Amino acid sequence: MQLDKIQSLENKLNSASIIERTNVLCEIIDQRGSCSFYDEEITQLQHALQCATLAKENNESDKFITASLFHDLGHMLTGEDVNSHDFLNNDKYHENVAASFLSKYFPEEVTYPIKMHVIAKRYLCSVQS
């Protein structure tokens, strides 16, 4: 995402309520989430919705559901949402980008799971293989 677009997004979020912020970020995922990552047959939008749905079905808190929905927002903020697989070779730490960006607008109960999701996934992959 280009710097001017990020600044425009920040301006919208700064003057928005928590519900409006969530809606604005959902629009970003809806607009930019049409590409797929890795070798999966699923788009970023589908992945975000699946994660949030699983969290809801497991009776997680609203904050955890929000984290589940926005956990890969960093891919979009760093421009890794353009069907390029460059990020597989050049880690831009999308989890830290998203957590840092969202920390201005959401509590730690939302941003901490986002920050930790990559490390958690790597751990699970290592013990389940």
Language-model features: locations:
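Metal-dependent phosphohydrolase cores
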Residues: 1-129
